[in-house]
């Protein structure tokens, strides 16, 4: 079936694809990463990294300390921060603290990371530079495991032994190899906004409420409004907000799952009206209003989940394709675990490749694929279901939040 010594072709330069490239590169295993976009693409929002995700990556990179990661990726790294979050939930209409862990006994296990910074940090964690080729949009895959060719829209062709599909929820690779797997659209409204303020404005308007936490989570009556630090520079604090809620009936004007990409960047009047009617408390009301949104970059995000059966994974493997990241386990962003499983995918697949290569490749590519999916399939597919359920639980009625808060206050 071919020895695991030939070039690996990786489609997509997100955190899963870069992890799947960095670790083999550090072990002398040739691979090429192909990315459809330009090097300037922006994914500057922040994500939450959990211990099960980053600890595996740090171990695979040579037992690096957590401080190495936080110095490189924490949104507040330029002011000495470590990406810390308080894990608290507040009533976004009163500011009341509803749920919060005991900060005196809690160690930092969740790290906020700027996504752009994380991509660069992974790419830089080794002596040899990664071979990332931008402007390569996949057209099709030809061949089989051990002898496969990737053909791109710029007419470039590359041969390899294995294709790693790291090209996201709308994976071109998956749509060709497994056309029966169609992302499931979740009936949720999700708008995302980006803006920046001066340090003095941040210290006046947000810091009194957030403290040193990199995210200020506000929950309401079936809707959420988290405010998050994306990046801190010498002069500005870059932030984002989300407004999310379940769909209301069949004629919800804000539910536009198939909106064209350019139209998704436009602010619908119905959103402005809805935000102004929420009666938010500070600091949310200072930013989530029709006047402030005039200076924000606002995006409509469609929430989609992807499930792949074991048989689908096996069939794709026989055709020379293995999946990592959102291409096979996309899940809700807020309350999800997607970035962590993307890291874990890259680590576990790379470990299977490295192990097979160390044995002289006698196991073949088919056993690399089987070894990877033996653990990754159940882990990731369960996470999709868990994250989707958690998303709806985080959008519960205000009455239920109050009941939870009261129970937390009662002595054990």
Curated annotation (Swiss-Prot):
Keyword Cytoplasm part of the UniProt annotation: no
Signal peptide: 1-21
Residues with attached carbohydrate: 68, 92, 170, 231, 251
Keyword vocabulary terms for this entry: FAD, Flavoprotein, Glycoprotein, Monooxygenase, Oxidoreductase, Signal
Top-rank lineage group of the source organism: Eukaryota
Pathway: Secondary metabolite biosynthesis
Residues holding FAD: 35, 46, 119, 326, 339
Cofactor requirement: FAD
GO molecular function: FAD binding; monooxygenase activity
InterPro entries per record: FAD-bd, FAD/NAD-bd_sf
The enzyme's E.C. designation: 1.-.-.-
Keyword Ribosomal protein part of the UniProt annotation: no
Pfam family for this entry, one: FAD_binding_3
Job description of the protein: FAD-dependent monooxygenase; part of the gene cluster that mediates the biosynthesis of neosartoricin B, a prenylated anthracenone that probably exhibits T-cell antiproliferative activity, suggestive of a physiological role as an immunosuppressive agent. The non-reducing polyketide synthase nscA probably synthesizes and cyclizes the decaketide backbone. The hydrolase nscB then mediates the product release through hydrolysis followed by spontaneous decarboxylation. The prenyltransferase nscD catalyzes the addition of the dimethylallyl group to the aromatic C5.
Family: Belongs to the paxM FAD-dependent monooxygenase family.
Record's protein name: FAD-dependent monooxygenase nscC
